A protein has these predicted regions:
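Walker B catalytic acidic pair
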Residues: 255-257
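Glycine-rich phosphate-binding loops of NTPases
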Residues: 1-139, 152, 202, 323-324
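RecA-like P-loop NTPase motor core
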Residues: 275-279, 292-342
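Conserved D-loop-proximal element of ABC-family nucleotide-binding domains
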Residues: 262-263, 267, 296
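H-loop/switch region of ABC-family ATPase nucleotide-binding domains
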Residues: 287-289
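Loop/turn-to-beta-strand initiation segments
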Residues: 96, 248-251, 279-285
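Conserved hydrophobic alpha-helix in the ABC-type ATPase nucleotide-binding domain
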Residues: 269-273
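Extended helical coiled-coil dimerization/tether regions that scaffold
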Residues: 106-113, 119-252
Length: 342
């Protein structure tokens, strides 16, 4: 707090989030209800079932943080949690959040996130029919490289030196190997590359600009979400649903994209999110200081956050006339024409 005189030995924080299940109003089959059914609650007889999550965390003077994720099973009239239950790792993975940071050099975060996404997809692929072909090809590559005169000479000297030091039965003959025949080992070296480049045909993604890396990460997230959605609906048989374990809900959070992207890219991001995200299985949040972003978002979806004199965040919405007409059209066009006012 801004008026704090002495730092306490421990700070505490809690956050709660409600997830509603409007798909229960329909009789269609879905993959989202079953994992959360045991923790669903209703606030009224005709209400929509929901699940409430509560994240509790404490931070010591040294900055070490302890956190706990809980289900809120019962709360009083003021919303204070009375009965809770821990969220298991299996249930935690049912909801995934992908975060695109605001800093201009997001390479570390994006590289880790991209590898995690690709790894999850590749582990869900059935490689059994390809193992024999891959092993045959990798053996040919190793034999071709090993037949080099210089490599042969070095291998002979290495073998002689090693045998003078090691007399055991096992590990008696060292060889230079260049490539593994196991598919899982090969996949660890997989990367995303682009063609064509300015000075070479194949360009690794590490050479992209900060903005391009951000767009690549978003592309991977949206692609992964599309695959998971298709697998859950039974529209795709290319991945093993038990290995892929698609989340029942995906949240994409983008912080101040104007920091690393040119203005003309912002519209493309919003369009990509509009076409891929939505419905009962996904949601996207964009935090921004750029008024131009408001032109690309429906006024009903805009939330304005501001600190009051006590440094408590107040959330405001744009009030639109209830019925469609000239008044509603006027307010909507005013937001898009003069977003800096809002």
């Amino acid at each position: 707090p801004f008026d704090e005189v002495e730092a306490p030995e421990e700070r505490s924080l809690w956050l709660e989030a409600d997830f509603h299940f409007p798909e229960l109003l329909k009789e269609d089959d879905n993959a989202t209800v079953a994992p959360h059914f045991a923790h669903m609650r209703m606030d009224s007889e005709d209400g929509i079932p929901r699940v409430r999550y509560r994240l509790e965390a404490t931070m010591g003077l040294a900055g070490d943080i302890e956190e706990t994720l809980l289900y809120v099973l019962d709360a009083n009239e003021e919303g204070v949690a009375l009965t809770t239950a821990p969220v298991t790792r299996h249930h935690r993975n049912a909801i995934q959040m992908h975060y695109l940071p605001a800093r201009r050099d997001p390479a570390d975060h994006i590289t880790y996130g991209a590898n995690a996404l690709l790894g999850r997809l590749l582990r869900a692929v059935d490689w059994e029919l390809d193992r024999g072909v891959v092993q045959e090809l990798t053996d040919k590559i190793s034999e071709s490289l090993s037949s080099n005169v210089s490599i042969k000479a070095f291998s002979e000297i290495l073998s002689t030196t090693w045998k003078g030091l090691h007399r055991g039965t096992f590990f008696s003959d060292p060889k230079l190997t260049f490539i593994t025949s196991e598919i899982e080992s090969l996949l660890r070296h997989m990367s995303v590359s682009f063609t064509p480049g300015h000075d070479e045909n194949l360009v690794d993604f590490s050479r992209l600009s900060d903005g391009q890396k951000s767009m690549l990460y978003l592309s991977l997230v949206l692609s992964s979400h599309a695959i998971g959605r298709a697998v859950l609906k039974g529209e795709s048989k290319a991945f093993d649903v038990k290995r892929l374990k698609p989340p029942s809900f995906t949240l994409i959070a983008i912080e101040e994209p104007e920091n690393s992207l040119s203005p003309h890219y912002l519209g493309r991001i919003v369009n990509a999110l509009d076409s891929s995200i939505g419905g009962a299985d996904s949601q996207a949040l964009i935090a921004t200081h750029a008024p131009s972003m408001l032109r690309r978002v429906e006024p009903e979806h805009i939330r304005y956050l501001r600190l009051d004199e006590n440094r408590v965040t107040k959330v405001s919405t744009i009030q639109l006339p209830e019925k469609d007409g000239d008044a509603r059209k006027f307010v909507r066009e005013a937001v898009q024409a003069f977003p800096e006012i809002y």
